[in-house]
Amino acid sequence: MQRKLNQSLLLAEAYFKRKFTMPEVNYELRGIKAGVAYLQKNEIKFNRTLLQENTDEFIRQVVPHELAHLIVYQMFGRVKPHGKEWQLVMNEIFKLPADTCHQFDIKNVQGKTFEYRCACQTHFLTIRRHNKIMKENIEYLCKKCRGKLVFVDDEE
């Protein structure tokens, strides 16, 4: 992990011809995200469980992905999170695909989900979204068919 951070930082320093401060790193991120970059703090939080379950791919892709966010912020300020500046760092400097989402199995980090259906498929919503629907009458729509998601109540 530290070696990949160092290697990636050196590549960025050579490309931009300037020094970057090594970010603070912790492994306390929970949920389904693999990593999060905190731009103003120069800090990266990684998901320990996803790292342990997907070590090689995590180090190869997620570590530089999050570091790229910090480098972009320090070079260009506030820009789109996965915009052209970030893609430049990923593609040109790190020589990696500019993937915005990981493909890791999330069953061990996901938490309880609730089954919903629309006209075209089944969806599994987090407890947070389920509670918003139940308590606040929020509606969620399917991205494919634009149909309303309807709770499948197992107890009926």
From Swiss-Prot:
Protein name: Protein SprT
GO biological process: response to stress
Keywords for the protein's UniProt record, in alphabetical order: Cytoplasm, Metal-binding, Zinc
Taxonomy, superkingdom: Bacteria
Domain (SprT-like) ranges: 11-152
Record localization: Cytoplasm
Annotated family: Belongs to the SprT family.
Co-factor binding details: Binds 1 zinc ion.
Residues of the active site: 66
Disulfide partners: none
Binding site for Zn(2+): 65, 69
Gene Ontology cellular-component annotations: cytoplasm
Recorded GO MF terms: zinc ion binding
Primary gene name: sprT
Entry keyword annotation includes Transmembrane: no
Taxonomic source organism: Haemophilus influenzae (strain ATCC 51907 / DSM 11121 / KW20 / Rd)
Pfam families to which the protein is assigned, alphabetical: SprT-like, Zn_ribbon_SprT
Keyword set includes Cytoplasm: yes
Cofactor dependence: Zn(2+)
